[in-house]
Amino acid sequence: MDHKMFCFQCEQTAGCAGCTGKAGVCGKTTEVAELQDQLTGALVGLSRAVDNAPDTNEGTWRLMIEGLFATVTNVSFNEKTIRELIDRVHEERARLIPNCSGCPSSCGRNDDYDMAQLWTAQEDIRSLKSLILFGARGMAAYAYHAMMLGYADEEVNRFFAKALFAVGEDWDMDALLPIVMEVGEKNLKCMALLDKANTESYGTPTPVTVPLTVEKGPFIVITGHDLHDLKLLLEQTAGKGVNIYTHGEMLPAHGYPELKKYAHLKGNFGTAWQNQQKEFADIPAPVLFTTNCLMPPKASYADRVFTTAVVSYPELTHIGEDKDFTPVIEKALALGGYNEDKPFTGINGGGTVMTGFGHGAVLGAADQVIEAVKSGAIRHFFLVGGCGGARPGRNYYTEFVKQTPADTVVLTLACGKFRFNDLELGTIGGLPRLMDVGQCNDAYGAVKIALALADAFGCGVNDLPLSLVLSWYEQKAVCILLTLLHLGIRNIRLGPTLPAFISPNVLNYLAENFHIAPVTTPEEDLKVLLKR
């Protein structure tokens, strides 16, 4: 490889082919990209050690999960923290196989893997291994959040080692394809684990209207996915005159009873991650990043950005494992917030949004939904969700939702919803036509809803009047897509572009076996999907 870097794991990769210049489209430098490859290679080496040694423990799995999560797009831009992770991985490998370093044989069985071997592999092998690796990275984010709440699953943990091991082996397509599908299977189990962790910790989400107006006075904006960090921040700010506003994927937190009981959790600020450099530029408040998606902050507001957990960026203030958010709170008090209430709107001008329509809430109204379908009030369901992003063409999803007929229901999730979640679509059968199921990991909830409807109507999921129209950006979308394929769900529309790491042969396999297809135009796709 004669280029400076190679990365094609996100939807915005350069030229829909791969970032190969001095920096990635996401903003990471060539040095960070190289270190992420080194970290991944070290994790493959660790998986080899796990395969050869029985002495694994909770620390082994936490390190493997943390290392994978750190390589997800827009998580870590910090050379120092990635180097520290590499050192920790090497130390853990040495602990697992202490006799290996003194062995006179140089078998290389437990060595780090050279990622250049993957990037230069035959394109179909590279494609399948990329699906395994990127899917494992996305799944690691969910496992990490569950782990922070004290929930873990040995089968899920061991699969991370299995997936990494497969990346480093010289296996053919017949050996790799079952592991690709197993990513989807294990991610379903992992999302179920996180759903259990969240609901047992914070209660079952219920529908709630969330204001977009920011009240006067000091406030903190918290973004990302980690509900545990939000809970700790709410506890530490209670009674201090500092209000809390969610941003991006943190919006669904408002539906959880144990979070919304805090009176100073006031509302939601801003929209999806790709708009942060504009939205954060002038706010008189700090922003706390708990997970991706962090964009390189502009100098005008960098002193107000804080990171925690695996999120890291050079020279930003990082909140460590003690989770003492005092610096964030002090910054909020010093900045003071707005002098008077300041109204904001969503992308389409709406002043409020709704969330909290998780599987618990929707299935709680199952009789109402079933009756609406049987009576003809509801003709079709659409799941329009997934990642937000900056590539031109994503307004497709706004127009698609706007054009859905009045006798259809739109379920949504993840940050792609901000393109349309402030629209007023009215009600149907006593329910809102637009229902936010939650974060990207709440795809598990959408699956539960679909399976319950199929059971109620005595049919398969693919026989339901249900269509999936998905947007993707990073690696969590990869593992969710593989979960849907594992469940045998067909006729998915995916956009705004197809992954650069999917080779033509692998794409043909997906098209032939699952009828997955790229989005075209809202008008044409609606016409086709409503005929099903």
Regions found by a protein language model. Give the residues of each.
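Electropositive, gly/pro-rich neighborhoods at or near active sites that engage anionic ligands
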Residues: L43-S201
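Anaerobic metallocofactor- and corrinoid-dependent redox/one-carbon enzyme cores
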Residues: D2-V32, Q36, G41-G45, P178, ...
